[in-house]
Design a protein with these regions (language model features):
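Bacterial Sec-dependent N-terminal signal peptides
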Residues: 1-4, 8-43
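Boundary/entry segment of secreted carbohydrate-active catalytic domains
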Residues: 26-101, 105-107
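Active-site beta-loop-alpha junctions enriched in small/polar residues
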Residues: 55-61, 107, 168-170, 232-237, ...
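Short, acidic/polar
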Residues: 64-96, 201-209, 313-332, 360, ...
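Substrate-binding cleft and catalytic face of glycoside hydrolase catalytic domains
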Residues: 97-308
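A structural motif corresponding to the C-terminal end of an alpha-helix
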Residues: 98, 151-163, 205-228, 286-301, ...
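Aromatic-rich peripheral "rim/lid" segments of glycoside hydrolase catalytic domains that contact
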Residues: 114, 227, 233, 237-277, ...
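Glycoside hydrolase catalytic-domain groove-lining segments
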Residues: 132, 140-159, 276-304, 310-412, ...
Length: 489
């Protein structure tokens, strides 16, 4: 998962096309992604995966609502911030064509639902909450970003897609005050008992907001399968990159915050306040227990991580998945509830040469032995368009083996991380200038490290267009990644 303003360009890489003819006879065009000449990715893979997803940004900005807060129309109030992709109807149409689920890059993270911009929640009004562990604590009187939940759900509904909720529990992009006395970023860390109570309140509050929105918008009940948010990343990136491969006794050399590279560090530098408070995996088990208590039983609960194919990190993810599934029942909200894990989500930020397909597939098969898998944030770094196209083809040929026709647990969702390069985390600072003529090809014709044959530069134009514009003259080297994915089916 990438942080604010770090959106991948993978989908644009998939949609970058050339003017030559592919082997299956489909015409390769440079048309807009809505054109009939551009095939739908979700339709192409409809017989292989339940869901094809896109990661999108709605934007963090001032909102005003016309009408009821659940069903009304949300617009930019012009007071602060800037709308992004999902806010615009043009992008909603493209998303609807190519995907049946989306993941929001930032909008549902604790940072943006709590909206304590300086890390402090001490000045916000409070109310009393009695948690299932018996702790009675003060909690914020509301989620300051509640309107952002409803605005993004409304935009997804308008786009005709479902959503993977991202994310409930994370070491990063969670306000410092959430972990500290009086919600002050300068306070002492709270006890694990208080933190458990806060954790339950937060998950309960977010999921109840979603449930209220779904009820108001005609989604037919808690256990019916008819949900806009059909899956949640309950915990994100809790394993350390330098995790050890053996765990004995009290040795915790696997969790983020316990290893030499993460211990004692701030979250921005790889540490974890969660681990500082708990010193073990208890908070992870709690998260899946709380999510099971407050989410519909048919909403999928996921553990999500990156570098999941590394030889030392794969066993750490296996370990936590098995611990979640073996977790004991506790009384939550008056009912006996066990932790529930349905999915291991492989972020899949990969390169064209590392990991190898074999290394990735070996990790995938280990995870499938435990649960279903989501490929949750797929993008591929590459040095050229041809290199990227080859990598995409190889990955999709491998992934589809584990789709609907695979016996046992399956890959049920593949999400492509990003739809344009405007704020790419892979190559955010490279600008290319093709000359004086600009032609708008929204979201289609760029790739990770895409290089023109002539070494010319491409740059964004200023003005009112919210999407980049490009001059695609006859020397512009568009790539074949989109057709590689289509043709690998």
């Amino acid at each position: 998962m990438k942080k604010l303003l770090l959106v991948s360009v993978l989908f644009t890489s998939l949609l970058a096309v050339s003017c030559s003819q592919p082997s299956n006879g489909i015409s390769r065009s440079q048309d807009n992604w809505l054109a009939d000449s551009v095939p739908s990715i979700k339709q192409t893979y409809s017989d292989t995966f339940d869901y094809i997803g896109l990661a999108v940004e709605y934007g963090i900005f001032g909102l005003k609502c016309t009408g009821d807060k659940y069903t009304g129309t949300y617009t930019h109030d012009k007071s602060w911030g800037t709308p992004s992709e999902l806010y615009y109807s043009e992008v909603q149409q493209g998303i609807s064509k190519h995907a049946n689920t989306i993941t929001l890059g930032n909008e549902l993270k604790p940072q943006f639902l709590l909206q304590w911009w300086d890390g402090n929640g001490s000045s916000q009004s409070k109310k009393t909450f009695t948690a299932s562990n018996g702790q009675t604590i003060q909690v914020p009187d509301k989620l300051n970003g509640e309107a952002l939940i409803y605005a993004t759900l409304n935009a997804a509904k308008k786009s005709g897609v479902k959503m993977r909720g991202h994310v409930l529990t994370w070491h990063s992009q969670t306000p410092e005050g959430f972990f500290r006395e009086k919600y002050s970023k300068d306070g002492a860390l709270v006890s694990k008992e208080v933190m458990t109570a806060r954790h339950e309140w937060y998950i309960k509050t977010v999921l109840e907001c979603v449930a209220q929105w779904e009820k108001a918008n005609g989604y037919a009940g808690k256990e019916t399968g008819n949900h806009l948010i059909w899956a949640w990343d309950v915990v994100n990136e809790a394993m350390a990159d330098d995790a050890g491969t053996t765990y004995t006794g009290t040795n915790q050399n696997w969790l983020r915050g316990s290893t030499s590279e993460t211990q004692g560090k701030d979250p921005a530098n790889g540490g974890s306040r969660w681990y500082e408070i708990y010193k073990n995996e208890e908070f992870i088990i709690n998260a899946f227990r709380f999510a099971n208590a407050y989410a519909p039983a048919d909403v999928k609960l996921c553990y999500n991580d990156y570098n999941e194919y590394q030889s030392n990190k794969t066993p750490a993810i296996e370990k936590i998945a098995n611990l979640i599934k073996a977790g004991s029942a506790q009384t939550i909200n008056g009912k006996s509830v066990s932790p529930r894990l349905d999915v291991i989500a492989m972020q899949s930020h990969v390169g064209s040469s590392w990991p190898s397909i074999t290394e990735y597939e070996n990790a995938l098969k280990k995870f499938l032995a435990i649960a279903d898998v989501h490929v949750s944030e797929l993008d591929i770094s590459a040095a050229s368009s041809s290199e990227a196209a080859t990598a995409y083809a190889n990955y999709f040929k491998m992934l589809k083996k584990y789709g609907k026709n695979y016996s046992g647990n399956k890959i049920t969702c593949v999400t492509i991380w990003g739809i344009n390069n405007e704020s790419s985390w892979i190559n955010p600072s490279t600008n290319y200038n093709t000359g004086e003529k600009y032609k708008s090809y929204p979201l289609l014709f760029t790739i990770v490290d895409n290089v023109a044959k002539t070494k010319k530069e491409v740059q964004y134009t200023s003005g009112t267009e919210f999407l980049p514009q490009y001059d695609l003259g006859d020397t512009y080297d568009t790539n074949n990644s989109f057709w590689a994915v289509i043709n690998s089916h």
